[in-house]
Regions:
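Conserved residues at the C-terminal ends of beta-strands
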Residues: 1, 88, 131
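Amphipathic, non-transmembrane alpha-helical secondary structure
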Residues: 10-17, 21, 40-47, 72-79, ...
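A structural motif corresponding to the C-terminal end of an alpha-helix
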Residues: 18-30, 115-125, 155-156
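Hydrophobic faces of well-ordered beta-strands that scaffold small-molecule active sites
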Residues: 30-32, 54-58, 83-85, 126-130
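Gly/Pro-rich active-site loop or hairpin
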Residues: 62-125, 134-143
Length: 156
């Protein structure tokens, strides 16, 4: 829930506190992916859970496609919790009734040069994994993934 006063919010906090406590016993972390909630809501949830093994898998396209944040600005809010990054491109929703669209990397609205620069500024040195969910046929998918990888390598 985006409202921390929602009756379900305390249940989510309790469940995550339990899960992360159990994972910590085994030296494991729990990562939540960005997307359906604004970055400040995810940060508040992490802070309310209060365990030091709860982090974020940052997906810039999800933040755009759900209309929740500019991905570069979102790093100002969540940067210290980012432990994994999806390289995925997308656009903001065009109506209030549907999600934005996914695009091949470098063809959508994610400002990848600015995004990579901001990742470096916050000291992020973890993985950047290409995520590609567009069904375009095997050969076209392969080509767009290869082109996206080359584009990312040119700005890393």
């Amino acid at each position: 829930p985006t409202n921390c006063r929602d009756v379900n919010y305390t249940g989510v906090v309790s469940a995550l506190r339990y899960i992360t406590s159990e994972l910590k016993k085994h030296g494991q972390n729990f990562l939540m992916e960005t997307g359906q909630e604004p970055p400040i809501v995810l940060r508040r949830l992490i802070e309310d859970v209060g365990n030091d093994n709860l982090f974020v898998n940052y997906d810039p396209a999800n933040l755009m496609m759900y209309g929740n944040a500019n991905p570069v600005d979102g790093l100002n809010v969540l940067g210290q919790y980012v432990r994994s990054v999806h390289a995925k491109d997308g656009s903001y929703p065009e109506t209030g009734y549907e999600l934005g669209s996914e695009f091949p990397i470098g063809k959508g609205k994610v400002d990848f040069p600015g995004f990579i620069k901001k990742l470096k500024e916050i000291g992020y040195d973890g993985p950047v994994s290409v995520e590609y969910e567009i069904e375009a046929g095997n050969e076209r998918q392969k080509q767009e993934i290869i082109e996206g990888k080359k584009y990312l390598e040119s700005i890393l």
